[in-house]
């Protein structure tokens, strides 16, 4: 799991890097675990853009990932490690002892031929899934449930993991990849280890066309628009934005304004806010 660099034959290869895909063992997905998903491309039912800068991109089949780890007490053997076009993390195809098959996120260090199990009494080994109350302090976990039985929602991106820092009463304290420290019910399940493909955030796109392959359209600066298109627009030549602070297309503060609801019930579960983005 590393990066492959290109010699600077062209301007795009000078600043381009890709994953070396050395951990991939199978090119074609398990057909029974794929489905077609309609991609809205940022449009609503009337065709109006509701999320900007989305559209196009290569065709994809969605892989049905088991975020709930529903096969409790049944041993699963790692058959393949596969590429998933819908996420930066790799996925693992498990063959269970009862004949079923399923995909999970690839934990770093798990290899073909290894075994994993979902159980409250499972050993603390990479890829095993347990309730948070059964996992020792200091352990790195991923695919953590926010609410018991709803499936993993936290720490699912490539290279991410959360750390168990305390246990008190009905709650377990987690330090999340963002730096946020929050309480989660001790009955929520989590998977041991860190998500694989840790170099994903070091990949350099290199050219605009590669972003289009990923389904991302160009982002135009507001300062080069007309005043009827953006609050920053207008002026003669290269003009400043003409405001005290940058704002969004709809006039809301663009830098630093908190967007989380102030009366959200789960605010009391957050002990430390996430680090401010740079």
UniProtKB/Swiss-Prot annotation:
InterPro entries per record: NA-bd_OB-fold, Rib_uL2_dom2, Ribosomal_uL2, Ribosomal_uL2_bac/org-type, Ribosomal_uL2_C, Ribosomal_uL2_CS, Ribosomal_uL2_dom3, Ribosomal_uL2_RNA-bd_dom
Keyword check for Ribonucleoprotein: yes
A GO-annotated cellular component: mitochondrial large ribosomal subunit
One GO-annotated biological process of the protein: mitochondrial translation
Record's keyword terms, sorted: Chloroplast, Plastid, Ribonucleoprotein, Ribosomal protein
Location of this chain's protein in the cell: Plastid, Chloroplast
SMART domains cross-referenced by the UniProt entry: Ribosomal_L2 (SM01383), Ribosomal_L2_C (SM01382)
Region (Disordered): 222-241
Quaternary data: Part of the 50S ribosomal subunit.
HAMAP family reported for this sequence: Ribosomal_uL2_B
Family matches, as PANTHER family: LARGE RIBOSOMAL SUBUNIT PROTEIN UL2M (PTHR13691:SF5), RIBOSOMAL PROTEIN L2 (PTHR13691)
Protein family (similarity comment): Belongs to the universal ribosomal protein uL2 family.
Name of the protein in question: Large ribosomal subunit protein uL2c
Gene: rpl2
């Amino acid at each position: 799991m590393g990066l492959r660099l290109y010699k600077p034959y062209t301007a795009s290869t000078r600043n381009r890097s890709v994953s070396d895909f050395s951990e991939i063992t199978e090119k074609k997905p398990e057909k029974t675990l794929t489905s077609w998903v309609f991609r809205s491309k940022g449009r609503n039912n009337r065709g109006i853009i509701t999320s900007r800068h989305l559209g196009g991109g290569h065709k994809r089949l969605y892989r049905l990932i088991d975020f709930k780890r529903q096969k409790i007490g049944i041993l699963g053997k790692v058959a393949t490690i596969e590429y998933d076009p819908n996420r930066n993390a790799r996925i693992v195809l498990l063959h269970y002892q009862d004949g079923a098959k399923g995909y999970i996120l690839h934990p770093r260090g798990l290899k073909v031929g290894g075994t994993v199990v979902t159980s409250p009494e499972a050993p603390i080994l990479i890829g095993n899934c347990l309730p948070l109350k059964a996992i020792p302090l200091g352990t790195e976990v991923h695919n953590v449930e926010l609410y018991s039985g709803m499936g993993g929602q936290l720490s699912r991106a490539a290279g991410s993991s959360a750390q168990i820092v305390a246990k008190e009463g009905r709650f377990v304290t987690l330090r999340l990849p963002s730096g946020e420290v929050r309480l989660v019910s001790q009955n929520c399940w989590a998977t041991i280890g860190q998500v694989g493909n840790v170099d994903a955030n070091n990949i350099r796109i290199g050219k605009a066309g590669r972003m289009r392959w990923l389904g991302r359209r160009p982002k135009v600066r507001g300062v080069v628009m007309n005043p009827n298109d953006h609050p920053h627009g207008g002026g003669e030549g290269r003009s400043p934005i003409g405001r005290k602070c940058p704002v969004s297309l709809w006039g809301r503060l663009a830098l630093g304004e908190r967007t989380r609801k102030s009366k959200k019930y789960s605010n009391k579960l957050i002990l430390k806010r996430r680090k401010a983005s740079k």
